[in-house]
């Protein structure tokens, strides 16, 4: 049953994408004409797509403003393509830092030679090998009281 339902859904989806199964259209009566809402919407969008965007300046705040080259440069080469430069707002992140890096070695390493000559005490204690003979002593009583048993 599940396979049949899955196959039916897949066939319906494929027919829908291919356009074999048209969508149900209900006529809307307006002023004596039968108009289908989908067709009316397409006409409206087609006419709005042809209108220039500068009229309302809807995308103005979203797009960066291009920097125009001087008119003298365009007059020299009228047949050449004109390049429009835009401001790179991420340039400070891509460019390396100016000047040398800060020397922070003195934090971990002393600067003077006198300090290097002295022996620095080892921070790790020297571990001695202990050879066990026989079974290990039971030390559980140190962590657990006798009342727990």
From Swiss-Prot:
Keywords on record: Endoplasmic reticulum, Lipid-binding, Secreted, Signal
UniProt tissue specificity: Predominantly expressed in the intestinal epithelial cells than in the liver (at protein level). Abundantly expressed in the uterus during late pregnancy by uterus epithelial cells. After birth expression rapidly decreases and is no longer found in the uterus by the third day. Also highly expressed in the small intestine where it shows a proximal-distal graded expression.
A cellular component annotation (GO) from this entry: endoplasmic reticulum
Signal peptide: 1-20
Alphabetized InterPro entries for the sequence: PRAP
GO molecular function terms listed in the Swiss-Prot or TrEMBL record: triglyceride binding
Annotated localization: Secreted; Endoplasmic reticulum
Consequences of knocking out this gene: Mice show an increase in the length of the small intestine. Gain significantly less body weight and fat mass when on high-fat diets compared with littermate controls and are prevented from hepatosteatosis. Show increased cytokine expression and altered gut microbiota, and are significantly more susceptible to oxidative insult by ionizing radiation, showing accelerated mortality and enterocyte apoptosis.
Region ranges (Disordered): 51-79, 97-122
UniProt-listed GO biological process terms: cellular response to X-ray; deactivation of mitotic spindle assembly checkpoint; DNA damage response; DNA damage response, signal transduction by p53 class mediator; negative regulation of apoptotic process; positive regulation of intestinal lipid absorption; positive regulation of phospholipid transport; positive regulation of triglyceride transport
Compositional bias per record (Basic and acidic residues), positions renumbered to this chain: 66-79
Superkingdom in the source lineage: Eukaryota
Subunit: Interacts with MTTP. Interacts with MAD1L1.
Alphabetized PANTHER family for the sequence: PROLINE-RICH ACIDIC PROTEIN 1 (PTHR37861:SF1)
Protein name: Proline-rich acidic protein 1
Protein source organism: Mus musculus
């Amino acid at each position: 049953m599940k396979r049949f339902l899955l196959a039916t859904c897949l066939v319906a989806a494929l027919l829908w994408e291919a356009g074999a199964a048209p969508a149900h259209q209900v006529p809307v009566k307006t002023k004596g004409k039968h108009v289908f809402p989908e067709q009316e919407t397409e006409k409206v969008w087609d006419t709005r797509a042809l209108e220039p965007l500068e009229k309302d300046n809807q995308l103005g705040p979203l797009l960066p403003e291009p920097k125009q080259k001087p008119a003298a440069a365009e007059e020299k080469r009228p047949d050449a393509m004109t390049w429009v430069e835009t401001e790179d707002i991420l340039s400070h992140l891509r460019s390396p830092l100016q000047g040398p890096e800060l020397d922070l070695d003195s934090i971990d390493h002393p600067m003077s030679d006198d300090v290097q000559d002295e022996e620095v005490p080892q921070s790790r204690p020297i571990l001695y090998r202990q050879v066990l003979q026989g079974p290990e002593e039971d030390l559980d009583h140190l962590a657990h009281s006798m009342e727990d048993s």
